């Protein structure tokens, strides 16, 4: 075997083959759920194997969207996710700029504490969080869920923004200041365009985290009209029986916003993650 052919074979076996297995491991369940969502519930109960549904029906989507309040759950998730992401994005930008550009006493300790907050599992603090939200009368409210999303997501995203902004030379700030820009203008007109891939990464990561959040919403929300999609899907599982076709349709609907977001920002997302890895 030629050395060049041998190298190519080794590369395929060590890189592409594991990636193919990983994609199949992730992709087959998604394709199976998509197939289930277009099948009649009776065929699933009977255990009939049909990868391609016959006949194809959208009744499951209509059922979960209208009769199981998924439309309401979807709106609630949009409200909490976009509301939280808007605040997280700009506060992370300001925090990242401050940590990158300013030298203040206790800066290193402050950053270590920020990082340590991400090492504590959320469930460890659930009892204290629940009592605090009840005392503040913010339990069972979407506003309270937004505040908790912001509090839990801000530390890590601030450190990410610090990493991205740290890769921009300080001379750019000084040149903008000489041209008459104040601090806010430097951040929004100079820094933000320069770190757009990184800022997009922060926004995408924060949105997906908020959209997929389950524990806080399940613990604090008692009014079914305020449930997000992640909690609402649980109630598609019956006590004695489950319509798996309807459940699959609900899961596919819940996947649409993150998939659309990733498809839209994937170019910036990949470059931003690479930049963060290099600049960190």
Model-derived features: where do they sit?
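A structural signal for multi-pass alpha-helical bundles of membrane permease subunits
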Residues: 2-280
């Amino acid at each position: 075997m030629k050395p060049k052919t041998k190298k190519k074979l080794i590369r395929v076996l060590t890189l592409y083959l594991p990636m193919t297995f990983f994609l199949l491991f992730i992709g087959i369940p998604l394709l199976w759920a998509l197939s289930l969502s277009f099948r009649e519930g009776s065929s699933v109960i009977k255990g009939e194997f049909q990868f391609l549904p016959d006949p194809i029906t959208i009744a499951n989507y209509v059922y979960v969207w209208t009769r199981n309040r998924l439309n309401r759950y979807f709106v609630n998730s949009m409200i909490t996710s976009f509301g939280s992401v808007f605040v997280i994005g700009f506060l992370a930008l300001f925090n990242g700029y401050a940590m990158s550009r300013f030298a203040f006493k206790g800066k290193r300790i402050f950053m270590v504490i920020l990082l340590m907050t991400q090492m504590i599992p959320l469930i460890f603090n659930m009892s204290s969080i629940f009592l605090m939200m009840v005392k503040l009368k913010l339990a069972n409210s979407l506003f309270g869920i937004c505040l908790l999303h912001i509090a839990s997501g801000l530390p890590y995203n601030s450190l990410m923004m610090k990493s991205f902004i740290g890769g921009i030379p300080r001379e750019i700030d000084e040149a903008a200041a000489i041209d008459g820009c104040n601090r806010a203008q430097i951040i929004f007109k100079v820094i933000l365009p320069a770190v757009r891939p990184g800022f997009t990464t922060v926004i995408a990561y924060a949105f997906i985290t908020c959209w997929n959040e389950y524990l806080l919403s399940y613990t604090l929300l008692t009014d079914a009209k305020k449930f997000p999609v992640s909690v609402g899907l649980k109630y598609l599982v019956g006590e004695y029986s489950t319509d798996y076709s309807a459940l699959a349709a609900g899961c596919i609907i819940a996947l649409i916003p993150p998939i659309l977001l990733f498809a839209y920002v994937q170019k910036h997302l990949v470059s931003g993650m690479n930049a963060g890895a290099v600049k960190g």
